[in-house]
Amino acid sequence: MSTEASTGETPEFQSYDHRGSPTQEAMKREIQSLIQNLVKLSRTAPAIHVLIPPEIVMYVEGSRNPDIYNREFVETVQRMNQMLKGRSEALQALQAQIAHQLQIAIPEMKDDIERAVEATGGKVPITGITLDP
């Protein structure tokens, strides 16, 4: 049962004036503006030199997100830094152990050993303290 039959009222219609011609003109202006901007961009692009790593270009060409590449790169660098830090700390501990053992074995060279270790950025352990091997 319709509303107009039960209430006795006639339905109201809203009408919109379709302005085809102005809409087409606006679209034409937008397309022309877009084309002009693309022409400007293509003319200025050769003058701008941006070095993009080929790996990122390959990611984009393979429809992959370059942010993923950046995240993976940062994670790899962090792992390598941790590994190198561990190696550096191990070498410092080895240097300290060798310096300590040399000071015990050749006490008359204590000053020379300390200078050599300190010159390379290391710290000489105090004589008399045993270090864990």
From Swiss-Prot:
GO biological process, one term: regulation of transcription by RNA polymerase II
Keyword Nucleotide-binding included in the entry's annotation: no
Principal cellular location given in the protein's record: nucleus
Annotated family: Belongs to the Mediator complex subunit 10 family.
Record's function text: Component of the Mediator complex, a coactivator involved in the regulated transcription of nearly all RNA polymerase II-dependent genes. Mediator functions as a bridge to convey information from gene-specific regulatory proteins to the basal RNA polymerase II transcription machinery. Mediator is recruited to promoters by direct interactions with regulatory proteins and serves as a scaffold for the assembly of a functional preinitiation complex with RNA polymerase II and the general transcription factors.
InterPro entries: Mediator_Med10
Record key words, sorted: Activator, Nucleus, Transcription, Transcription regulation
GO molecular function: transcription coregulator activity
Subcellular location(s) of the protein: Nucleus
Quaternary data: Component of the Mediator complex.
UniProt organism field: Phaeosphaeria nodorum (strain SN15 / ATCC MYA-4574 / FGSC 10173) (Glume blotch fungus)
Residue span of region Disordered: 1-28
Gene behind this protein: NUT2
Polar residues composition-biased segments: 1-13
Protein name according to UniProt: Mediator of RNA polymerase II transcription subunit 10
UniProt feature, compositional bias: Basic and acidic residues: 15-28
Lineage of source species: Eukaryota, Fungi, Dikarya, Ascomycota, Pezizomycotina
Annotated Gene Ontology cellular component terms: mediator complex
